[in-house]
Amino acid sequence: MGFRGAWNKRNRLIEDLDTFLKLYKKAQKAYKKVRKVEFSNNDELIENAKKRYQEIWDEFRAFVNKKAWVDPKLWATIRKMNQTGDRKVVKTYSRDSQVISDFVNHTIAVHNGKTFVPIYITPEMVGHKLGEFAPTRTFRSHPEKSAKVVKKK
């Protein structure tokens, strides 16, 4: 799919954040229940839990499919800050979340594997992923050639 596909999704956002959060939490609960039930020896319980989880997951995927992904907790936090007018730094591990118009003029600290890199969101960043602005590797310059290097013949 690559970058072009992700760029095409930038205008297709999830309309209802509350429903999105509800389905997300419901799917997480169902998954935890499946993991918990797997330790029991009752095959019927395991099958019912897996079936229930699959139904919830299918509903969640249908709701989210072909839309820009934004971490629901991050989005809810930013939405609260927009309503109250706060401008605190928000820490997130979600590098795969797409920058949406609600994030503009906020500072989001994205984890690069070692530290949180603060990123001030501008309108030009909308449509890109948060991870693009927090590099995970540090570039150390190429080694200088020393006088000891001998040419091979």
Curated annotation (Swiss-Prot):
InterPro entries: Ribosomal_uS19, Ribosomal_uS19_bac-type, Ribosomal_uS19_CS, Ribosomal_uS19_SF. One of its GO terms (cellular component) is cytoplasm. Residues 1-63 are annotated as: Unknown. The keyword Ribonucleoprotein applies. Belongs to the universal ribosomal protein uS19 family. NCBIfam families: rpsS_bact. This is Small ribosomal subunit protein uS19.
